[in-house]
């Protein structure tokens, strides 16, 4: 559970709250726990970076949470630029990771590309880095398509391509301006 400081800024989740023992206690004491078919959590969701700019050491969060869950979703709605500034190395879900996939959790990040990058309103991206329990691409795609519009706005999709190309070609320079 995130915290608020004296200025009302939300986050971060304290490190002890991510530890396996704490998560196990919270799960067993949850009012719906007795109705669950199994007590094994599937996914942890972490807002990284918050609206106020609070971000996590993603590697440390993965190491802690990965002891309890196989999948971590970093909601990085306001953080699509992190890869392009060395100051944020290791602090975003799609960070460079030399660990073998079987030794780390699967990481999903979502970026509301329209918020801080050059994409049209409502444009967003989902990124997946498979780990010890890879996502089934066909199942994921089927679920995604079930919730996507049958009448997509192609200008929004094109703006994602333009934004990606802009950042791919000059993102580091743009982040230093």
Residue ranges: model-predicted function:
Residues 1-177:
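Conserved PLP-enzyme active-site core in the AAT-like
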């Amino acid at each position: 559970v995130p915290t608020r400081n004296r200025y009302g800024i939300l986050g971060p989740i304290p490190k002890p709250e991510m530890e396996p023992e704490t998560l196990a206690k919270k799960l067993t004491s949850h009012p719906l726990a007795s109705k669950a078919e199994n007590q094994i959590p599937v996914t942890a969701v972490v807002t990284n970076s918050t609206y106020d700019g609070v971000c996590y050491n993603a590697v440390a969060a993965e190491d802690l949470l990965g002891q309890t869950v196989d999948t971590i979703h970093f909601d990085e709605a306001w953080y699509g630029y992190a890869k392009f500034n060395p100051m944020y190395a290791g602090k975003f879900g799609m960070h460079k990771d030399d660990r073998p996939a079987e030794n780390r959790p699967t990481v999903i990040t979502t970026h509301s590309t329209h918020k801080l990058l050059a994409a049209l309103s409502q444009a967003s991206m989902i990124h997946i880095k498979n780990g010890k329990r890879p996502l089934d691409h066909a199942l994921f795609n089927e679920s995604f398509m079930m919730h996507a519009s049958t009448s997509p706005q192609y200008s929004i999709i094109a703006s994602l391509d333009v934004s990606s190309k802009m950042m791919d070609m000059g993102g580091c320079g743009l982040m230093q301006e």
